Amino acid sequence: MTVTAGGAVLHAVPAGAQTVSESAARLTAVSSTAKAATARSARSAKTVRSAKAARAARQTSKARRAVAVARHQVGDPYRYGATGPGAFDCSGLVQYAWKKAGVRLPRVASSQFARIKRKVSWRNLKPGDLMFFNGLGHVGMYVGHGKMVHSPRTGERVRIDKLGGWRKSSFVGAVRPGA
């Protein structure tokens, strides 16, 4: 209701309605609650990012170790079914290297590809990634700079080869152990 008294306009506040100061107080409380919720959400997001970064750092550290172990086997002979030390087949080499880095892998290439969930494209390879060729019949470990370490076949030795040519055309996929 509006009443005029001596040139002044007075508004009557209906029963149960809020005054301007009460509305301002409620708005301030809502704003404070929203700010607190936003701060909690930001802290939670930061914690999630920190946890992901820590996992990625652990995986990278293990991958470096696996690459170093695999590189150390260069010159060892290929022997079908061998898991080292001293002789390896292709899947035995990568299994041995990752085991030394603290990650257990299945024994054969096809199981390694199937059981490791983190799949990686050719363009996104990182050192330590396992690369599969020839319908999962061969596996090697990416060591960076367009090269892989692998135990090729009977009569040959563990070696580091450049990627390209037939390897790219027979590439099936790659996985990232320990991720």
Residue ranges and their predicted role:
Residues 173-179:
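Short, low-complexity, Pro/Ser/Thr/Gly-rich segments in the mature regions of secreted, periplasmic
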Residues 1-58, 179:
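N-terminal secretion targeting segments of exported proteins
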Residues 2-3, 75-88, 133-168:
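Glycine-rich catalytic cores of cysteine/serine-nucleophile enzymes that process amide/ester linkages
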Residues 76-126:
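Catalytic cysteine-centered active-site loop
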Residues 62-66, 70, 90, 97:
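Stable alpha-helical elements in mature extracytoplasmic
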Residues 69-72, 128-130:
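Short, functionally critical alpha-helical segments immediately adjacent to catalytic or ligand/cofactor-binding
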Residues 61, 100, 122-126, 132-134, ...:
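Extracellular/periplasmic catalytic domains that process cell-envelope and extracellular macromolecules
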